[in-house]
């Protein structure tokens, strides 16, 4: 457990260093491309993110659950190899379907710039699909940090170099875009080489495969695939609908603002990368005492860091956004609402992993489907009226409320947030007294959140001990 905590800390530092690099890149990127071009990239990546579901079809959950159960290294390597072959076959099918419906997509957006670049989705999809498949394979072997560094840090370092070159040589958007895709491809090659070195097997072992085993994987995979699809749609539908209703410029501003709000989400991503494979192993071995300890500790750590970041964004999100340009300051509420939604999500600790890798995995699909319906409905209602603020409200509301206790936690967070706004409105400048006052209130918020999560964890872990088992 200590080793995993160390890996989680390293992964979190990698993530936040990457966020810093990303903010620097975003700041300079606004000097070489317009908000409309940023919106174009966001829409291309959003469409790719939806298509990637059909390519991977639940492989993430399948690999974590079933590779962790295999004892033989040759069997694990064989399982990984078969997953890559299956993924590539699905990729070819998805590309054919995408080409068939390309005209419908272009008709929906009616944008000449998108028409010029839409076919770039094909190589982007291949690169992202292979990278994610390699990443999840390494996670199953508890080797997540290298993939995180490549995905989050190296690509941003190379991107920063590209931006400097673009500023110096005054590169066109087309050359900048092609160069960026080339950086993603280089990153993928490095990761695949690392995967080959770390998961080298002497021979393939297919002895674990049977018709019953295949049916079990297919049954589990279908539910997790649809759950993953719903999750992807939930995370992408806001950008897609903003692009069509508000325009590419609005999508560009929303994309910049959402980067800040999702900083809290990086905490949960680290938990998924590092601890979910362990959750799968502990459930398989029925090691509930270890699950209990992990559940309590992770929940506290997530809220401790998350609440600090949330408070910071409440006060300084507007100032941070104004760095990118006057128009971007309109994304203040996007940052705050998304940060609040992610903070609530962090409070659920490893609930998602426990549900997904237990016999109650169907619950994951049902809840995500309901949340998707809620998200799309609210987007249709709120975006025309409130623009990007309406989109983020719909997205924040649809972030997984895994348990009923979170409703109580949300109420307390909202009460605390109200006090913060009242205080902020009465402090004209941030002098030493104001900073001291904010620091004291921040300390009270931290203590309160930790108390609430401790109470909730005690209640929930008793339920998990009685109900959760591995199948």
Predicted regions: what they are:
Residues 1-22, 77, 81, 208-227, ...:
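N-terminal membrane topogenesis motif
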Residues 419-471:
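Membrane-proximal transmembrane or re-entrant/amphipathic helices at the cytosolic face
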Residues 127-153, 339-370:
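Membrane-interface junctions at transmembrane-helix termini in multi-pass inner-membrane proteins
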Residues 102-121, 313-343:
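Interfacial segments at transmembrane-helix termini and the short loops linking adjacent helices
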Residues 43, 119, 150-165, 169-198, ...:
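Hydrophobic alpha-helical transmembrane segments
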Residues 27, 56-71, 140, 200, ...:
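Helix-loop junctions and terminal segments of transmembrane helices
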Residues 3-64, 91, 95-99, 124-125, ...:
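Signature of the first transmembrane helix
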Residues 1-4, 169, 173-179, 191-235, ...:
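Interhelical loop/hinge segments that connect adjacent transmembrane helices in multipass membrane
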């Amino acid at each position: 457990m200590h080793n995993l905590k160390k890996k989680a800390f390293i992964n979190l530092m990698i993530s936040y260093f990457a966020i810093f690099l990303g903010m620097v890149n975003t700041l300079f990127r606004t000097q070489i491309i317009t908000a409309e071009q940023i919106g174009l990239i966001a829409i291309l990546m959003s469409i790719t993110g939806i298509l990637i579901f059909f390519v991977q079809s639940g492989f993430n959950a399948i690999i974590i659950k079933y590779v962790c159960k295999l004892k033989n290294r040759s069997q694990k390597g064989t399982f990984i190899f078969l997953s890559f072959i299956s993924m590539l076959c699905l990729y070819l099918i998805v590309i054919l379907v995408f080409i068939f419906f390309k005209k419908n997509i272009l008709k929906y957006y009616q944008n000449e710039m998108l028409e010029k670049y839409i076919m770039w989705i094909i190589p982007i999809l291949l690169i992202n699909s292979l990278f994610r498949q390699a990443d999840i394979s390494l996670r199953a072997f508890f080797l997540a940090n290298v993939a995180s560094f490549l995905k989050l840090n190296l690509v941003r370092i190379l991107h920063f170099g590209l931006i400097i070159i673009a500023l110096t040589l005054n590169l066109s958007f087309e050359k900048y875009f092609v160069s960026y895709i080339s950086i993603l491809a280089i990153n993928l090659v490095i990761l695949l080489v690392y995967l080959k070195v770390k998961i080298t097997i002497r021979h393939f072992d297919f002895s674990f495969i049977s018709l019953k085993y295949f049916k079990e994987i297919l049954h589990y995979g279908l539910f997790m695939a649809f759950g993953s699809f719903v999750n992807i749609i939930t995370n992408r539908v806001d950008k897609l609908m903003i692009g069509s209703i508000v325009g590419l410029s609005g999508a560009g501003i929303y994309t910049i603002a959402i980067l800040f709000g999702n900083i809290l989400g990086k905490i949960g991503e680290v938990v998924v990368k590092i601890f979910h494979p362990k959750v799968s192993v502990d459930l398989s071995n029925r090691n509930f005492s270890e699950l209990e300890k992990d559940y309590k500790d992770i929940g506290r750590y997530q809220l401790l860091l998350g609440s600090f970041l949330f408070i910071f964004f409440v006060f300084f999100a507007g100032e941070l956004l104004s760095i990118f340009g006057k128009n971007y300051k309109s994304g203040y509420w996007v940052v705050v609402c998304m940060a609040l939604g992610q903070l609530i999500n962090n409070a659920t600790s490893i609930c998602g992993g426990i549900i997904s890798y237990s016999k109650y995995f169907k619950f994951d699909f049902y809840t995500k489907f309901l949340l998707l319906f809620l998200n799309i409905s609210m987007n249709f209602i709120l975006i025309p009226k409130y623009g990007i603020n309406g989109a983020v409200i719909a997205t924040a509301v649809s972030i997984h409320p895994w348990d009923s206790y979170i409703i109580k936690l949300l109420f307390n967070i909202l009460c605390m947030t109200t006090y913060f706004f009242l205080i902020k409105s009465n402090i004209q400048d941030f002098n030493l007294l104001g900073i001291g006052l904010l620091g004291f209130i921040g300390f009270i918020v931290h203590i309160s959140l930790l108390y609430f999560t401790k109470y909730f964890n005690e209640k929930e872990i008793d339920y998990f001990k009685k109900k959760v088992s591995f199948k």
